[in-house]
Amino acid sequence: MTHTTPLLPLAPPINLVDLRYNELHNAITAFGEPPFRAKQIHEWLFSHHANSFAAMSSLPLRLREKLAERFTLQRPEVVEVQESCESGCLRPTRKILLKLSDGALIECVLIPAEERMTACLSSQAGCPMQCTFCATGTMGLQRNLSAGEIWEQLYALNGLALQEGKTITNVVFMGMGEPLLNTDNVLEAIATMSSRNYNLSLSQRKITISTVGIVPEIERLSRSGLKTKLAVSLHSARQEVRQQLMPIAAERYPLPLLSKSLEAYSKATGEAITIVYMMLNGVNDSKEDAHLLARYCRHFSCKINLIDYNPILTIRFGSVQESQKNEFQAYLMAQKFHVTVRKSYGASVNAACGQLVTQQQRRTIK
């Protein structure tokens, strides 16, 4: 009897947009092509936004054929655009739902202001951190996004901005996922969006990476030479309260350890860190909470950003009264901290801070 080895299924071709630049460079040189072709292809992908290999007209036909044999070229599909215009808004906040090449769904948000157009980008499909006030955490982690998929969000949002005669001026990594659990791809995307070779050419100082406090990666950023800004979701200077709100982040990186990394970051970069503090009624809004927050933040250069709780489906915290928030802010300012109260945009379409969760969680998209 003859036995045959079953054929293993072939791996699906790689989407060219998902390659990091060094991976693209290696693939091109493996084809026997000169290295400058990698730069040309990268510009076709991210500056000209080519949708096919045939469109890359400056490349030799033989190279385009090799690319088509080895790779696919798939762009995200815009599934839905929702708008929210709260009282007094000049322009609507807009949220885009994108479907990626493997079917994963992510959201990104365009936030307008008088002098700025801010793109709020996701770094992961879902999130593993399980913060109790955040809708994204209910999804769990599906996967990291590639640098190309991060860039595609910026491209899509800039298209909306261009409809109003504007362009993106600022980027915040405050969408779905924890950026510092996908640091390599986030940094690769930042390198592209801040490069002079590409259309937007954003200043790195206009880009903010927001984290729950992944200490080893904060230390990595402090050594990286990046000029981006850092925001840290703190939400309580009491370890036991922070563990209730952010169980994974607080347990892995307790407040004293996080403080040391922020102090080192501030000294290494000379930059003030933004401490993000979501005020929750009866949880972290007392005078003692304000006192502990001020004491905690004395160890590093920072500004404090107070934000309102935005309701999500799974857990109902209470919002803080305006008078209570004003007292909290006044105390911190009396302690010589720069304190701002962030205005929430997009709550009516679940686009505000902590509300991003793909529509797959609310209804099925066919």
From Swiss-Prot:
S-adenosyl-L-methionine binds at residues 177-178, 210, 233-235, 310. [4Fe-4S] cluster binds at residues 127, 131, 134. Binds 1 [4Fe-4S] cluster. The cluster is coordinated with 3 cysteines and an exchangeable S-adenosyl-L-methionine. Keywords: 4Fe-4S, Cytoplasm, Disulfide bond, Iron, Iron-sulfur, Metal-binding, Methyltransferase, rRNA processing, S-adenosyl-L-methionine, Transferase, tRNA processing. It catalyses: adenosine(2503) in 23S rRNA + 2 reduced [2Fe-2S]-[ferredoxin] + 2 S-adenosyl-L-methionine = 2-methyladenosine(2503) in 23S rRNA + 5'-deoxyadenosine + L-methionine + 2 oxidized [2Fe-2S]-[ferredoxin] + S-adenosyl-L-homocysteine; adenosine(37) in tRNA + 2 reduced [2Fe-2S]-[ferredoxin] + 2 S-adenosyl-L-methionine = 2-methyladenosine(37) in tRNA + 5'-deoxyadenosine + L-methionine + 2 oxidized [2Fe-2S]-[ferredoxin] + S-adenosyl-L-homocysteine. GO terms for cellular component: cytoplasm. This is Probable dual-specificity RNA methyltransferase RlmN. Belongs to the radical SAM superfamily. RlmN family. Its EC number is 2.1.1.192. GO terms for biological process: rRNA base methylation; tRNA methylation. Coiled coil: none annotated. It comes from Chlorobium chlorochromatii (strain CaD3). Its main location: cytoplasm. GO terms for molecular function: 4 iron, 4 sulfur cluster binding; metal ion binding; rRNA (adenine(2503)-C2-)-methyltransferase activity; rRNA binding; tRNA (adenine(37)-C2)-methyltransferase activity; tRNA binding. Disulfide bonds join 120-353. Residues 113-342 form the Radical SAM core domain. It is found in: Cytoplasm. The active site is at residues 107, 353. Specifically methylates position 2 of adenine 2503 in 23S rRNA and position 2 of adenine 37 in tRNAs. Its cofactor is [4Fe-4S] cluster. Reaction proceeds by a ping-pong mechanism involving intermediate methylation of a conserved cysteine residue.
